[in-house]
Regions:
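Anionic-ligand binding region
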Residues: 19, 23-48, 63-71
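Short, surface-exposed amphipathic charged segments that create phosphate/polyanion-binding patches used
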Residues: 16-19, 41-44, 98-104
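Hydrophobic packing residues within well-ordered alpha-helices of enzyme cores
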Residues: 13-14, 71
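General beta-strand structural signal in soluble alpha/beta enzymes
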Residues: 4, 21-23, 87-88
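Single conserved hydrophobic/aromatic residue that forms the stacking wall/gate
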Residues: 1-12
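Short secondary-structure boundary/capping segments
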Residues: 3, 44-45, 108-109
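A contiguous loop/helix-start segment that scaffolds small-molecule binding in enzyme catalytic cores
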Residues: 49-142
Length: 142
């Protein structure tokens, strides 16, 4: 049996953060164990250039404690510091946490391997305590 981790994760976060991946999005792992960091950097830059909402897995570890900050610096070359972001930690476990913040704030945030990070696109908004990326770019689709 094959189970999709992305679908499971997206379903878990939907109720936690709102609708962070409502339009085109990409999922990028920051782990360089099997993928060279240079390729991860290119993928981050391309996702930012394309105005994708982004989901980041494996954002940090003991050996890669600064990779999220490196990723944020790459994204800030094309995305506004006010871009809405969200983090979830320990989804479905004791101590579950969520937080909505800006890309500038995310740059200064420490996370671990139990954290999933979401970076919105140019249309993503904070609505109450939810992160919402509308399905279309026209304002009447929000």
């Amino acid at each position: 049996e094959i189970a999709s981790c992305l679908v499971g994760s997206e379903m878990c976060i939907r109720d936690r953060l709102g609708a962070p991946l409502g339009h085109d999005f990409t999922v990028i792992s920051l782990s360089d164990l099997l993928t060279p960091w240079e390729l991860i950097e290119r993928r981050l830059a391309a996702a930012a250039e394309g105005d994708f909402a982004i989901c980041l897995y494996n954002p940090s570890s003991h050996k890669r404690h600064d990779y999220l900050q490196k990723a944020c610096q790459i994204l800030l070359q094309k995305k506004s510091g006010d871009t809405i972001c969200g983090i979830t930690r320990n989804i479905g476990r004791d101590g579950e946490e969520k937080r909505i913040l800006t890309l500038d704030e995310l740059l200064e945030t420490q996370v671990d391997m139990f954290t999933t990070v979401f970076i919105g696109n140019s249309q993503t908004r904070k609505v109450g305590d939810a992160m919402v990326t509308p399905r279309g770019y026209r304002r009447d689709n929000a």
